[in-house]
Amino acid sequence: MSKVLVATTGTEFDAQAIDEALKLLGSGHEYLILTVLQGEVPAIVGDGGGIAPVMHIPPETWIEQEKQDHVLAERRIRKTLSELGSDVEIRVESGDPGERICAVAVEEGVDLVVVGSHDVGTLRRVLGGSVSDDVAHHAPCPVLLIRHRDV
């Protein structure tokens, strides 16, 4: 039985990526569903290309919000996987999604990483890249990209 890491980032595309992975791979695998929530304040790029200042938010507020985000992400994933008969582990972590996904793939010795992919636009790809690009280039094993389809 192979070990498959299905990586999600707490977006609305998660259920679709998980569904597609299960359709393609079937139930004869051990699944690790990893959701990585980016636990930092994103910078805002203004119209002129400058970075807008981000207002200060107390750490306690961020910590509480992050806890709530973890609970909601796990609840959504459990709902999506309720009919699956395979061995499933769910983990929710914080940090840089690309880095954490690749690190967990190494730690767990997975055979395949499945990650959703959608068009983030050329500017964003140049400035910050995308999670799927990062994982595709740095994962220690094969990567299956599930392209987001418009619904």
Question: Where are the regions a protein language model picked out?
Answer:
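Small/aliphatic-rich secondary-structure junction motif
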Residues: 2-57, 86
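Structural beta-alpha unit
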Residues: 13, 79-113, 150-151
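General small-molecule cofactor/ligand-binding pocket signal
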Residues: 32-34, 89-93, 144
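Glycine-rich, Arg-bearing micro-motifs that act as flexible, cationic patches
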Residues: 112-138, 148-151
